[in-house]
């Protein structure tokens, strides 16, 4: 929505060497605002509860996931598709989980640009390190369970491809705004922010803002993406907005889940600035000859100016 080339994104997603997923890109309404919705559609073997509000915040487990999204903007990738816009990626492997090495192999199997591939691996590395710290295991032993890994793989590869395609020099993230309370996940009910998010924002110095509403607004995947791309927290003093993107979240909170990205341009100042260090001291009982010699040495070694002022006490 901020200006990344959709054809580039779809070409990358078609090349992912994993089956069992599709995507749908559409416009949706959030708080009466039109936002871009990027939806990863998983087949029955990969469906998860990540967007099921009753499961996430209710007292009873829910298995309602809703139907698949079938529109003209929907593209299914993998052997389970029967549409003209489907792409097959080989057999469907029934792994219970994927390690970081296997995920790296999946990323290497795409036709992403090298710069985008490096970014995708960086995001997953940040995520794996945060999970490893949370569970007290080495990074090599962290496994992303398949019920949640496939959509994360697609999300992260898509994010890396889009950010790389935009060709931005800096990414400024003043803060991530987080909710409060608890959320249900695979390991039980956890406080918000969840441990993986906590570890990421601690490690990378990301500021969290308090929304004051219950719910998990910052997910581990989102925090990892932010940590990987953020270069600054401070907006430039003056800038020109040249692009604007609004992305829709999937969870249904009281406060609409929206992510805004602004493309900014800055101009070089018409003036030049420099910094000068001024040194001052009091000198007692020193001859004029010594002071004169000291002045010569200071000027020879780069001092802009040297002067003496007599002091009477």
Show the residue positions of the predicted features:
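Glycine-rich nucleotide/cofactor/substrate-binding loop typically near the N-terminus or early
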Residues: 4-134, 194, 203-208, 213-214, ...
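A short linear hydrophobic-aromatic micro-motif
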Residues: 21-25, 304-311
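Divalent metal-coordination and catalytic microenvironments
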Residues: 38, 151, 226, 298
